Amino acid sequence: MAGHSKWANIKHRKGAQDALKAKIFNKFSKEIMVAVAKGGSDPNSNPALRLIISKARAKSMPKSNIEKAIAKGEGSTSNGENFKEIIYSGTLSHGISVIVVILTDNINRAIASLQALFRRANGQIGKQNSIPYLFEQKGYLEIEKNNLDEDDLMLFSLDNGAEDFQSDEENYMIYCQPRKISELKNEIEKKFSPNFRAVEISYFPNEWVELDQENTEKILNQIDNFLDDEDIQNVYHNLKFA
């Protein structure tokens, strides 16, 4: 079944590719360190680490960077354990809802920065660790089409725990329950050896808000400002854009 990729509307990233990759890799490194500190350095016995490594590889993070992050996590366990994940909901102008995921070793600094970001965006910060009913958490796999047969991949995915399957001109998009993502990804990898473009557990909106081009660009610039903050890992939103 064909459909528009929801993912393109949820996670917006800047176009300066080199700087962008460096920021993304730094965020992955921090997640890897925390996962190692909590569950050890062996991905086979640490599902959280295994998922993060899959995410990082899907975004072309070099193997050497991943290994360095694992080594840092092993060598500085106390530092890894000091990182805390907190989630804030909030609204920007024009009724755009956001979920902001923070991973920080200084909660007071992170919250102060977040409050300032919402003020500058003329938005309103919500409660900590409260997820609006507008969003649902799902596992998400994005796979390059290449020469993969759509029907074969769709049927195999649905037989192995996928809940939805979509496609656009370049990619297949597969959705599942968060607890199923590692198993589903592994089964697809063994069967098809595809090129994964994304492996994520993410928040997807149940309702979208569509704005004119001028206001869409303003909101996207505000989201960029959030993502520039060193403590902010991800921003999910319900703004629909082309």
UniProtKB/Swiss-Prot annotation:
One of its GO terms (molecular function) is DNA binding. One of its GO terms (biological process) is regulation of DNA-templated transcription. It comes from the Bacteria. GO terms for cellular component: cytosol. InterPro entries: Integrase-like_N, TACO1_YebC-like_2nd/3rd_dom, TACO1_YebC_N, Transcrip_reg_TACO1-like, Transcrip_reg_TACO1-like_dom3, YebC-like. Keywords: Cytoplasm, DNA-binding, Transcription, Transcription regulation. Belongs to the TACO1 family. This is Probable transcriptional regulatory protein mhp472. It comes from Mesomycoplasma hyopneumoniae (strain 232) (Mycoplasma hyopneumoniae). The lineage of its organism: Bacteria, Bacillati, Mycoplasmatota, Mycoplasmoidales, Metamycoplasmataceae.
